[in-house]
């Protein structure tokens, strides 16, 4: 079934890295890591969705989370990176995926807002280490 293939790839891609504890991202000898263009497109789409997000009601957080999950699926199913840059990206990506999943399951506006602010900050971190 072609339709479920990206979901399966996404799940297996995440599972392969889930056992690693959250680690501190390191620069590439003082420089930012280069992210492949096709992957960066999905990251920038998510960053834009977070930057332009306006909450009018609690359900908007869940809508944002679903939108972000779609881009995470596209990002992970199109993963072409290898080596140290790939490993460093995962140090950012796995906690980010966890945040999005928590936002999707948030139970109230206070929790949703706190998670949203953490998501905003995650892109500041991303831009410190990746280009």
Regions found by a protein language model. Name each.
Residues 13, 17, 76, 81, ...:
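Short flexible/disordered coil segments
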Residues 72-90:
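Short, solvent-exposed, charged loop/turn and helix-capping segments
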Residues 2-55:
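Immediate post-signal-peptide N-terminus of mature secreted/exported proteins
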Residues 27-38, 53-60, 81, 88, ...:
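Non-transmembrane, amphipathic alpha-helical segments
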Residues 9-17, 70-73, 98-99:
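The feature marks either
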Residues 38-41, 45, 63, 67-70, ...:
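Charged, amphipathic alpha-helical oligomerization/scaffolding segments
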Residues 49-56, 71, 75-78:
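Short hydrophobic alpha-helical module
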Residues 86-131:
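Helix-rich interaction surfaces within compact, conserved domain-sized segments
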